[in-house]
């Protein structure tokens, strides 16, 4: 039986009355975001708007993005990554379950030295995929070209942010590569493994 979204007390600075807000709004006010689902346009736009709003509100206080996601739409994930690079505050990324596919790309996009994985977290990288079987021949070729460009971009970002040679990243992206938190740290995707 679903419990819904819990309400928690919140008092704005300078106000005497406490109001009840849903837990996500309370966490947003503390600059904490959660990517706990498949990446799509809706969650991407929500996270982007929150990052931009809070960076305008106070551009010197870090933002924290907790990730437990199986991945999702590449372009939506790249939009989150680009926003993380664009906003002035550092964005700390924390993998707390699974960061797979484009979610691992978002994880690696956190501020270098501020990317963390919980001890039992898993990270998976691979090449971008598509649904070619639904396309006509002409569409198939155009989609293949676009997919190749996306793969090159993603590979370049992993190389830049992990410090690994391009041949290592390219080889790893050929198939699904699952890593433990310590393996992800050795691979340069995260900087720290949280202590139990």
Curated annotation (Swiss-Prot):
Class of the enzyme per the UniProt entry, highest EC level: hydrolase
The reaction(s) this protein catalyses: Hydrolysis of proteins to small peptides in the presence of ATP and magnesium. alpha-casein is the usual test substrate. In the absence of ATP, only oligopeptides shorter than five residues are hydrolyzed (such as succinyl-Leu-Tyr-|-NHMec, and Leu-Tyr-Leu-|-Tyr-Trp, in which cleavage of the -Tyr-|-Leu- and -Tyr-|-Trp bonds also occurs)
Coiled coil (residue ranges): none
Residues of the active site: 101 (nucleophile), 126
Pfam families assigned to the protein according to its UniProt record, in alphabetical order: CLP_protease (PF00574)
EC number of this enzyme: 3.4.21.92
Keywords assigned by UniProt, alphabetized: Chloroplast, Hydrolase, Plastid, Protease, Serine protease
InterPro entries associated with the record: ClpP (IPR001907), ClpP/crotonase-like_dom_sf (IPR029045), ClpP/TepA (IPR023562), ClpP_His_AS (IPR033135)
BP GO annotations: protein quality control for misfolded or incompletely synthesized proteins
Superkingdom, natural source: Eukaryota
Any one cellular-component term (Gene Ontology): endopeptidase Clp complex
Membership in a protein family: Belongs to the peptidase S14 family.
Subunit annotation: Component of the chloroplastic Clp protease core complex.
Task performed by this protein: Cleaves peptides in various proteins in a process that requires ATP hydrolysis. Has a chymotrypsin-like activity. Plays a major role in the degradation of misfolded proteins.
Entry protein name: ATP-dependent Clp protease proteolytic subunit
Phylogenetic classification of the source organism: Eukaryota, Viridiplantae, Streptophyta, Embryophyta, Tracheophyta
């Amino acid at each position: 039986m679903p419990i819904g979204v819990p309400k928690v007390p919140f008092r704005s600075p300078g106000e005497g009355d406490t109001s009840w807000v849903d837990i996500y709004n309370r966490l947003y006010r503390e600059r904490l975001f959660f990517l706990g689902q498949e990446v799509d346009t809706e969650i991407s736009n929500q996270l982007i708007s929150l990052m931009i709003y809070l960076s305008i509100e106070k551009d010197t206080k870090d933002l924290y993005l907790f990730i437990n996601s199986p991945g999702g739409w590449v372009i939506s994930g790249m939009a989150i990554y680009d926003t993380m690079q664009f906003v002035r505050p550092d964005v700390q990324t924390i993998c707390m379950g699974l960061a797979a596919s484009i979610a691992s790309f978002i994880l690696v996009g956190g501020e270098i030295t501020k990317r963390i994985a919980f001890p039992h977290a898993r990270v998976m990288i691979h090449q971008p995929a598509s649904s070619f079987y639904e396309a006509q021949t002409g569409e198939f070729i155009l989609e293949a070209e676009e997919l190749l460009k996306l793969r090159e971009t993603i590979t370049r970002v992993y190389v830049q942010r992990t410090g690994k040679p391009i041949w290592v990243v390219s080889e790893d992206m050929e198939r699904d590569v699952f890593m433990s938190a310590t393996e992800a740290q050795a691979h340069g995707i995260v900087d720290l493994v949280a202590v139990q």
